């Protein structure tokens, strides 16, 4: 049995205002990839922040409300299924992360991103008086478990996307979106074959392309 990899405590960069960024929804066959950026208030701490996947749905929902109430700033960013099909899921995710940071009403001077790569984040030209000035950034492997700002971002992104799937389920209950959240489960694949491909599906993803007859090895 392989031993579980242990990551050291994260050493924060020297910065005045740090934003954490995470994504949810790279794997599903349907809907936007959703990202979030969060700047926490050190004078208004939030207990229980951790990787959103390790929290119950009830706890995630409560923490999402608390994060939005207590954070200095938070923002959601998205990339549509059409953008995913055009750019591919990696580049669409990077675009959504950029949109999340751009949506913050306070500009950070450092951005920490979950994972092993991060996009380029540009300063607001009107504030910096310099075009194409980059915001410092760093990718953090397992950041959603090691960096509280990223944990907070993972929580509000997860809650936002799950709510979107619940809303989609009300429009198309025959697909079971509230249950599988768009992921390629056996049930979901059966429903696609039975009912067809909606406009909100990612047509470049293999299981969807196979149903459409557009997939080629």
Curated annotation (Swiss-Prot):
Top-level division of the source organism's lineage: Bacteria
Subcellular location as annotated: Cytoplasm
EC numbers on record: 3.1.26.4
Pfam families according to UniProt: RNase_HII
Catalytic activity: Endonucleolytic cleavage to 5'-phosphomonoester
Primary site of residence: cytoplasm
Keyword Zinc-finger appears in the UniProt entry: no
Entries under SUPFAM superfamilies matching the protein: Ribonuclease H-like
Record domain RNase H type-2: where: 16-217
One Gene Ontology CC term in the entry: cytoplasm
Binding site for a divalent metal cation: 22-23, 114
GO biological process: DNA replication, removal of RNA primer; mismatch repair
Protein family membership: Belongs to the RNase HII family.
PANTHER family: RIBONUCLEASE H2 SUBUNIT A (PTHR10954), RIBONUCLEASE HII (PTHR10954:SF18)
Protein name: Ribonuclease HII
Species assigned in the record: Colwellia psychrerythraea (strain 34H / ATCC BAA-681) (Vibrio psychroerythus)
Lineage: Bacteria, Pseudomonadati, Pseudomonadota, Gammaproteobacteria, Alteromonadales
Name of the gene: rnhB
């Amino acid at each position: 049995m392989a031993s579980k990899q242990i990551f050291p405590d994260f050493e924060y960069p020297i910065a005045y205002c740090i934003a954490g960024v995470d994504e949810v929804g790279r794997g599903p066959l349907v809907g936007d990839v959703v990202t979030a950026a969060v700047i926490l208030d050190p004078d208004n701490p939030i207990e229980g922040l951790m990787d959103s996947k390790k929290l119950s749905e009830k706890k995630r929902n409560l923490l999402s409300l608390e994060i939005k109430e207590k954070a200095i700033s938070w923002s959601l960013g998205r990339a549509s299924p059409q953008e995913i099909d055009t750019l591919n899921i990696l580049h669409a995710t990077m675009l959504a992360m950029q949109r999340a940071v751009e949506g913050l009403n306070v500009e950070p001077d450092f951005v920490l991103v979950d994972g092993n790569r991060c996009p380029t984040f540009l300063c607001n030209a009107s504030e910096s008086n310099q075009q194409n000035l980059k915001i410092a950034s760093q990718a953090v492997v397992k950041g959603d478990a090691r960096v509280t700002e990223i944990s907070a971002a993972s929580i509000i992104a997860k809650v936002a996307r799950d709510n979107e799937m619940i809303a989609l389920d009300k429009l198309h209950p025959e697909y079971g979106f509230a249950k599988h959240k768009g992921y390629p489960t056996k049930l979901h694949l059966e429903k696609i074959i039975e009912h067809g491909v909606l406009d909100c599906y990612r047509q470049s993803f293999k299981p969807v392309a196979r149903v459409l007859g557009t997939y080629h090895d």
